[in-house]
From Swiss-Prot:
Entry's family note: Belongs to the metallo-dependent hydrolases superfamily. Urease alpha subunit family.
Annotated organism of origin: Brucella melitensis biotype 1 (strain ATCC 23456 / CCUG 17765 / NCTC 10094 / 16M)
N6-carboxylysine carried by residues: 219
A single GO cellular-component term on record: cytoplasm
Main location class: cytoplasm
Record-annotated active site: 322
Top-level lineage group: Bacteria
Binding positions for Ni(2+) 1 per the UniProt entry: 136, 138, 219, 362
Keyword vocabulary terms for this entry: Cytoplasm, Hydrolase, Metal-binding, Nickel
InterPro entries tied to this protein: Amidohydro-rel (IPR006680), Metal-dep_hydrolase_composite (IPR011059), Metal_Hydrolase (IPR032466), Urease_alpha_N_dom (IPR011612), Urease_alpha_subunit (IPR050112), Urease_AS (IPR017950), Urease_asu (IPR005848), Urease_asu_c (IPR017951)
GO terms classed as biological process: urea catabolic process
Name the UniProt record assigns to this protein: Urease subunit alpha 1
Signal sequence bounds: none
Length: 570
């Protein structure tokens, strides 16, 4: 006879099911379970007296006979594709199956086999997301990787050589020698990583050698001279090699105005960094580029969301990052031209509309690498409070808004940089770069981070304790962050040209190299999932007011944000 239990008891035992609602951290964002791929009465759970035991939920089948390496049980998946509950089977470091796990000899409807060789990760009451992808990283210090991984980021794309002054300001690694050294360093860093070469040149030769040396993209930055000639040349090289171009345009409008930059694009696909402009770009109207079908517009997190402190902190940040002097009036004028409350306020709304497609960090160069995910959800929460529910949200939940915002740091950056065949979503066939969250700590402090199907970092107590939880309890590197496990569970993204030239053997790295694909004409703004709006944009050159399809975009700064001091005492 089937037994009935209360919804609350069920959720406590097996996690939420269809119709149950979950609050994300301390925000006002509520998600609702849309479907459940597990079977009531046949749920699998590990532990003493539980289901996953020999002859019960655990079969006799070997790995060769179809048993998984790892199963995450009863997980609530939050992905751009939907919000649903399922068991997740991992094999060879990839997501092999999503559905119902158990023992096919004793249970009906089993698609994911648990065998004697299967490890179990308890997903009951946990939210599972794809690992975050940060596509605007200044590689100033390797310690950024620890901060990023512990925040739920599993892929970092950017450039640099360490605390050199070129790197402090610009997100690119200049030349094949530096690119090789940086890629070699990745063998010691538990993270999927890609490198931008410097894209500022008016002739192709130097850019071509950087792509062949392992750059998975090129970065154009105003501090190196972002002229129409450099833009045109860089995009031509990118088209030839199928790599993405990221751009930080000319704030001072010395080499041309935003129209000149758009003309230099010639309709070719490009990733526009900090499209609002406080992070850099044509003053005051770089924000207009989000209306074009070939531009993939992004924000960096220092302006996310617009708060009472946003303007005040930017001036000093900018002076330091771009090697400016407070003693030089022209330097101060340059800095002040980039910081406009009107465009920052509009940026909040453009994200909520889905007109801005990506959020990244700008790590240690005006942005905080460990706060990319936090700032994204703070923006979503602020917009719900100020603008209400989105038209596509159903009464009682914020599922559509949640899917829109998670896409900004998972699938959309993966698509933009030719990595979506490997990462960016909780999807069968992709790498098992997954993050488990306690809902109360969602977006703030992960419960566990998997790289290539193995645990890379997790909260852990005193290693001399009799159990894993005695204080001090904090996030620590796990076995996936050491030795050859590290190099076998994370990858480096490069160009296909570098693969063809045998880069891995040439520079002697252990990590697997994976080529980026489909970064050029095959993608555009239409490819940005749930974030492909292209409103007609106008910016008043005197008041800086921003309009989209004729509507004034403005909102008030907030003085309190969620996911903040409640979670961080120090």
């Amino acid at each position: 006879m089937p037994a009935r239990i209360s919804r609350a008891t069920y959720a406590q035992m097996f996690g939420p099911t269809v119709g149950d609602k979950v609050r994300l951290a301390d925000t006002d964002l509520i998600i609702e379970v849309e479907r459940d791929l597990t079977t009531y009465g046949e749920e699998v759970k590990f532990g003493g007296g539980k289901v996953i035991r020999d002859g019960m939920g655990q079969s006799q089948l070997s790995r060769a006979e179809g048993a998984m390496d790892t199963v995450i049980t009863n997980a609530l998946i939050l992905d751009h594709s939907g919000i649903y509950k399922a068991d997740i089977g991992l094999l060879d470091g990839r997501i092999a199956l999503i559905g119902k796990a158990g023992n096919p000899d004793t249970q009906p409807g089993i698609s994911i086999i648990i065998g004697p060789g299967t490890e179990i990760i308890a997903g009951e009451g946990k939210i599972v997301t794809a690992g975050g992808i940060d596509t605007h990283v200044h590689f100033i210090s390797p310690q950024q990787v620890d901060e990023a991984l512990n925040a739920g980021i599993t892929c970092m794309v950017g450039g640099g050589t360490g605390p050199a002054h070129g790197t402090l300001a610009t997100t690119c690694t200049p030349g094949p020698w530096h690119i090789a050294r940086l890629i070699q360093s990745f063998d010691g860093l538990p993270m999927n990583i890609g490198v931008f070469g410097k894209g500022n040149a008016s002739l192709p030769g130097a850019l071509e050698e950087m792509v062949r040396a392992g750059a998975c993209g090129l970065k154009l930055h105003e501090d190196w001279g972002c002229t129409p000639a450099a833009i045109d040349n860089c995009l031509s090289v990118a088209d030839h090699f199928d790599v993405q171009v990221a751009i930080h345009t000319d704030t001072l409008n010395e080499g041309g105005f935003v129209e000149d930059t758009l003309n230099a694009f010639k309709g070719r696909t490009i990733h526009s960094f900090h499209t609002e402009g406080a992070g850099g770009g044509h003053a005051p109207d770089i924000i207009r580029v989000c209306q074009y079908p070939n531009v993939l517009p992004a924000s960096t997190n220092p302006t996310r969301p617009y708060t009472v402190n946003t303007i005040a902190e930017h001036l000093d940040m900018l002076m330091v990052c771009h090697h400016l002097s407070p003693a030089i009036p022209e330097d101060i004028a340059f800095a002040e031209s980039r910081i406009r409350k009107e465009t920052i306020a509009a940026e909040d709304i453009l994200h909520d509309m889905g007109a801005f497609s990506i959020i990244s960090s700008d790590s240690q160069a005006m942005g905080r690498v460990g706060e990319m995910i936090i700032r994204c959800w703070q923006t979503a929460d602020k917009m719900k409070k100020q603008r209400g529910s989105l038209p596509d949200d159903r009464p009682g939940n914020d599922n559509y808004r949640a899917r829109r915002y998670i896409a900004k740091y998972t699938i959309n950056p993966a698509i933009a940089h030719g990595m979506a065949h490997e990462i960016g979503s909780v999807e069968v066939g992709k790498r098992a770069d997954l993050v488990l969250w306690n809902s109360a700590f969602f977006g703030v402090k992960p419960d566990m981070v998997l790289l290539g199907g193995w645990i890379a970092t997790a909260p852990m107590g005193d290693a001399n304790g009799s159990i894993p939880t005695p204080q001090p309890m904090h996030t620590r590197p796990m076995f996936g962050s050491f030795g050859k496990a590290l190099t076998n569970t994370s990858i480096t993204f490069v160009s296909q040209a570098a693969m063809d030239e045998g880069l891995r053997e040439k520079i002697g790295v252990d990590k697997q190299l994976v080529a980026v694909v489909n970064t050029r004409g095959g993608i555009g703004k239409h490819s940005m999932i749930l974030n492909n709006a292209m409103p007609q944009m106008e910016v008043d050159p005197e008041t800086y007011e921003v309009r989209a399809d004729g509507e004034l975009l403005t909102c008030e700064p907030v003085d309190v944000v969620p996911m903040a001091q409640r979670y961080f005492l120090f």
